[in-house]
Amino acid sequence: MKFKKLEKRFSIVYNEAGTMQSFALEKLGALMSEFVSYPLNFVLEKDLTKELLERDNIAIIGTPDNSQIIKELWQNGIVDIPDDNQGYFIKYGKSPFCEDAFALICASKSEKGVMYGIVDLINEYFSDTMCTTARSAITDPGFFDVGFVEPTPEFEKKSAPAIKDRAVWTWGHCIYDYKRFFENMILMRLSSVVIWTDFVPINAKEMVDHAHSLGISVFFGFSWAWDNRALDFDVTKDESLEMWTKKIVCRYENEFLPTGADGIYFQSFTETKNDSIDGVIIAELVTKWVNTISSKLFEKYPSLKLQFGLHATSVKNKLEYISKVDPRIRIVWEDCGSFPYHYNPKNVDGFEETLDFTDKILTLRGENDSFGAVLKGMPTLCWSTFEHQRGAYMIGTQSREFVEKRSLEKRRMWKYIQAYWLENAQYAQKIIALMADKSKGQAFVQMLIEDGMLEDKIMFPSALCALMMWEPTTDKDTLLRKAAASKVVYMA
């Protein structure tokens, strides 16, 4: 069967911009090259002519600050750019430049938004309605159209994230290829990473710089007396607190500050089901520790972003103490009950209690509490073979062969996790929607992928969770379809 083909070829109009918009341009070019059989023409906006606008279909991306065309389209009401700097407006249809041509437009107030817009275009529009190549023998007009080659449905979308900070929580030695890891984060429109590490990687600054070039914030995590049982000191003694305060301030200044990271994540002695240590209430003691140590850091670095990783198991019945944690510190809650806080996505027993507890802690320190949470139900470390790092290491530089081999080893775990995310997605969605609503979008939500080989493939459960962070009020079945249909997502 012959298809009706577009009479005009596409040219991509671009401007010299930063790494994020360059990433978007690269991905757009790669996408279009999957469909067309001709070499794509890239044209600097300053070199654009009236003749080319009439001759070709046009794809253009940018912001009002770096593109005069985008600015004029925005001022004339042709594109509707969201106020949110992570938001974007994407449109595919009849060209505003020539009545018998087509145009693809992606506009935002920031380069990050442009990047997210192109990612969304790839994941949603070209996954739902397109075939992967114009030369595919299985192309069927009853299912697919061929993008950029034949007329396809007009498309328009204005979008911004419901949750501003969407992150991955992981261990440093479980990032095997940091460049691919961060790229796959961007393909899920994630904005931050929290990296727990025993030692600072020797290439930490290079890694942080690369993350920043893609608009990803980096928080390094380390112990503030996380496991006092394995260490020879008594957390109830003031001299222990004084010793740890000096140690932490010194470690931050000498090790983590030079990396250029955006902040610090820490855990103390709350990862236990007991609510007291040697007769002292853990919630009261940890609040004293956290406030004392952080005050010393804030004295010298008042704009430092601190995240307190708090396990609810030891403090859930003593929240009156936790409410006194310095409001400048973001409390990042975990182990708050059933899935999506539970490691096993099968475990949804007691969900209503978990939902009620989440509702309570969201505004524990007031209506504008600096709230965060770690959601689980993804691959974890294998604790039966785990060893702590013994010294400095190089992060994320393993070979492609290593990554592919280890990824195959993780496939069985992903299959189990995928099955229960499919069955219990509504529970995760309810929690995430509550966080987005009650925090007015200011929650810092992290999904724990401790050893899931994100640098190799974006697996369905992580893509679904990321999608929920962006648009938690979309109905569950639509979210499931979007995640499953995405060009970049793999099913186990």
Each PLM stretch: what is its role?
Residues M1-Y176, R180-L187:
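Solvent-exposed alpha-helical segments and adjacent loops
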Residues Y14, M491-A492:
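Acidic, low-complexity N-terminal propeptides/linkers enriched in Ser/Thr/Asp/Gly that mediate export
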Residues T49, D145-V146, E150, W169-H173, ...:
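Catalytic-core regions of glycoside hydrolase
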